[in-house]
Amino acid sequence: MNSGREPRTPRTLLSIADILAPRMVPRAPSAPQLPESGPGPTSPLCALEELTSKTFRGLDARALQPSEGRAGPDALGPGPFGRKRRKSRTAFTAQQVLELERRFVFQKYLAPSERDGLATRLGLANAQVVTWFQNRRAKLKRDVEEMRADVASLRALSPEVLCSLALPEGAPDPGLCLGPAGPDSRPHLSDEEIQVDD
């Protein structure tokens, strides 16, 4: 009954082997026929087929239905690796964000009692306030680092380039902002440029 090969798992019409293999009609439902020229049981194609079939078998039927605006691996629920499902992203109201930002300007870290009071006042969970402040501190850190990098790159520029960046386009004399050029570094204006109302 067994011709030296391991019994194969049933395949779907979407498996890679079915797509690549020539069309065949099985003779009996209990013993599917495979072409002799097909890949052997130890080929990479068979391994890939086995891996994908195990993966799709492990998925929940409800996980294949569209989730609430989320996509990606976390939307599939607990998988074979025991990952927990992520909580959905909190959409803060404009008033909540305004109050959180206002508090953050004065205080980057909250004491537990202050955090509880703020959460109660805004109608948020304590964990949401904690997470918001953590994310906001991380954003502040990124912004400060980006600003420092910008300042460092500006310091590396020549004064002429800095001047051209500082003046509006079409400015009359770019030489006005070059800094001290001699004993009298103030710009000189001609009589036509000075207007005096009588």
Swiss-Prot record:
One of its GO terms (molecular function) is DNA-binding transcription factor activity, RNA polymerase II-specific. Signal peptide: none annotated. InterPro entries: HD, Homeodomain-like_sf, LBX_TF. Keywords: DNA-binding, Homeobox, Nucleus, Transcription, Transcription regulation. Transmembrane segments: none annotated. Its main location: nucleus. One of its GO terms (cellular component) is nucleus. It is found in: Nucleus. CDD domains: homeodomain. The keyword DNA-binding applies. Residues 24-46, 63-89, 173-198 are annotated as: Disordered. Gene3D superfamilies: Homeodomain-like. One of its GO terms (biological process) is positive regulation of non-canonical Wnt signaling pathway. The keyword Transcription regulation applies. Residues 85-144 bind DNA. Transcription factor. This is Transcription factor LBX2. It comes from Homo sapiens. The lineage of its organism: Eukaryota, Metazoa, Chordata, Craniata, Vertebrata. The gene is LBX2.
